[in-house]
């Protein structure tokens, strides 16, 4: 299952690819917007709410989340409520990057550089870092 949300339908990216996934039926896709315009055929609401409505089964599953930090925080909280472990949850921190080469130091958190050591990390790895991200 893929839960894909945006503020509005205009903010959705990869629209053609998402339409192909919706048609293909190989993967369940839940499209959601915070604010829907007239005629929006999919869900209206926030991604963390969708997580609790879809209730993905943590057995043989990983969760990958990206987006605004506040959304990630609540998605992770809901995944934990559903039984996902820290090793099954991954997120990205590219918002902290600037040069992308590890030279400017902007993305340094504890002893890692997000640009060089990530930008995708397990929740377990993030919990071992100072809460600077």
PLM feature spans:
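Short acidic, gly/pro-rich beta-turn/loop elements at beta-sheet edges
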Residues: 12, 101, 125
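Alpha-helix termini
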Residues: 18, 80, 113-115, 131
